[in-house]
Amino acid sequence: DLHSFPTRRSSDLGNSHALAAVAGLPARRARPGRAGLLEIDPAFEDALLGIKQASHLHVLYWLHQAPRQTLRRPTPHDGVLRGVFATRSPQRPNPIGMAVAQRLRREGARLLVSGLDCLDGTPLIDIKPYLPQADCVPGATLAWQPAPAPVPAPAP
């Protein structure tokens, strides 16, 4: 029974705000590259010391409006039914979302970022710096995911 799983407790760090969001859609799905705001609770502002040294951040959040009972979902690319642990679906037993967001600027306890994939008002769980040498796995694949289009070379 999914409802008998133990519940973990954590402190919300604050909330995310999708700037110019389309109602009901995560910011990235609504408009790629849209800016978002991470509003950190003032009690955690000291934890932002040094954040300006990171160009990109892992942002973890609680997908508070996502159903938690779903264990299998069809994937959007091919419609094949898969377990949620094999997908990036927000519908999962512990609806934890993650995005790699570009840090644009810090204003006190607020971070302006680009690349959030969550609804306006989504509770923040954690923020970590993106480490290129540790977080990028060359050659990693997911067999059912279409290969990304090649990045064109810059014009001379």
Question: What would you call each of these model-derived segments?
Answer:
Residues D1-T7:
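Single conserved hydrophobic/aromatic residue that forms the stacking wall/gate
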Residues M98-C118, A149:
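Well-ordered alpha/beta subsegment
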Residues A143-P156:
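Charged phosphate-binding loop/patch that engages nucleotide di/tri-phosphates or the phosphate backbone
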Residues S4, Q91-V100:
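Short coil-to-beta-strand transition motifs
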Residues R31-R72:
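Short, well-structured hydrophobic secondary-structure segments
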Residues L116-P146:
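Flexible glycine-rich active-site/ligand-binding loops centered on an Asp-His dyad
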Residues L71-T87:
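Short, compositionally biased
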